[in-house]
């Protein structure tokens, strides 16, 4: 199985390492033609407005939107998968959620902690200017991770979105296995 990592911005190498640790092959996706031959795509963290603009500029936005690929979005990737953020920005709008950007504050407010993750128990989450799910717009959306009363992980069909960075934790590879089992192979 080949999992592509959108390589426009963010911690691409860390995602590639976590994918390999989970037992899959990783491939950088920088251009439209790089989408060929992948079984799923990861949209990493970074700055969501910049990633959205660059995806549009490089022709990736519509291609990804219409690709039917299973997608895991982390941090900014969650924002890009959402239907809205309260500001005008380019989004894929593939998941029936709205998000609050930077819900935990600024860069200096970043933190790490264990969170509850469906079927995995406790998973270590790294939160960096992280968003949270503000509203769930459909019964098709399933909450899979929480930080107290905050929704930090959701799944809808072949799409999964996380507020945190699983690629930055030792046990994060389990989240990639969960994504493959619950979104890619379904």
Curated annotation (Swiss-Prot):
One Gene Ontology cellular component annotation held by this UniProt entry: glutaminase complex
Gene3D superfamilies, per the entry: 3.40.50.880
Documented EC number(s): 4.3.3.6, 3.5.1.2
Catalytic reaction list: aldehydo-D-ribose 5-phosphate + D-glyceraldehyde 3-phosphate + L-glutamine = pyridoxal 5'-phosphate + L-glutamate + phosphate + 3 H2O + H(+); L-glutamine + H2O = L-glutamate + NH4(+)
Example GO molecular function: glutaminase activity
Keyword Lyase: yes
Keywords for the protein's UniProt record, in alphabetical order: Glutamine amidotransferase, Hydrolase, Lyase, Pyridoxal phosphate
A Pfam family this chain is assigned to: SNO
Entry's Gene Ontology BP terms: glutamine catabolic process; pyridoxal phosphate biosynthetic process; pyridoxine metabolic process
Protein residues bound to L-glutamine: 46-48, 101, 128-129
Disulfide bond annotation, renumbered to this chain: none
Source organism superkingdom: Archaea
TM stretches of this protein: none
Record pathway: Cofactor biosynthesis; pyridoxal 5'-phosphate biosynthesis
Active-site residue list: 75, 165, 167
NCBIfam families: PLP_synth_Pdx2 (TIGR03800)
Protein family membership: Belongs to the glutaminase PdxT/SNO family.
Description of how the protein assembles with itself and partners: In the presence of PdxS, forms a dodecamer of heterodimers. Only shows activity in the heterodimer.
Biological role stated in the UniProt entry: Catalyzes the hydrolysis of glutamine to glutamate and ammonia as part of the biosynthesis of pyridoxal 5'-phosphate. The resulting ammonia molecule is channeled to the active site of PdxS.
HAMAP family named among the record's database cross-references: PdxT
The protein, known as: Pyridoxal 5'-phosphate synthase subunit PdxT
Protein's gene: pdxT
């Amino acid at each position: 199985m080949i999992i592509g990592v959108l390589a426009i911005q963010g911690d691409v190498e860390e995602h590639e390492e976590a994918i390999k640790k989970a037992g899959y092959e990783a491939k950088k996706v920088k251009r439209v033609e790089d989408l060929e031959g992948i079984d799923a795509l990861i949209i990493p963290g970074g700055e969501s407005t910049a990633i959205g603009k660059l995806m549009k500029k490089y022709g990736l936005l519509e291609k990804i939107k219409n690709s039917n690929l299973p997608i895991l979005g982390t941090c900014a990737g969650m924002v890009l998968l959402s239907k809205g953020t309260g500001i005008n920005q380019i989004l894929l709008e593939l998941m029936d959620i709205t998000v609050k950007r930077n819900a935990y504050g600024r860069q200096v407010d970043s933190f790490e902690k264990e969170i509850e993750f469906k079927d995995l128990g406790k998973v270590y989450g790294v939160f960096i200017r992280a968003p949270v799910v503000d509203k769930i717009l459909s019964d098709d959306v399933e909450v899979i991770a929480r930080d107290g009363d905050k929704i930090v992980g959701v799944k809808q069909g072949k799409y999964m979105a996380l507020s945190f960075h699983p690629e930055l934790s030792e046990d994060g590879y389990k989240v990639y296995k969960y994504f493959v089992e619950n979104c890619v192979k379904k």
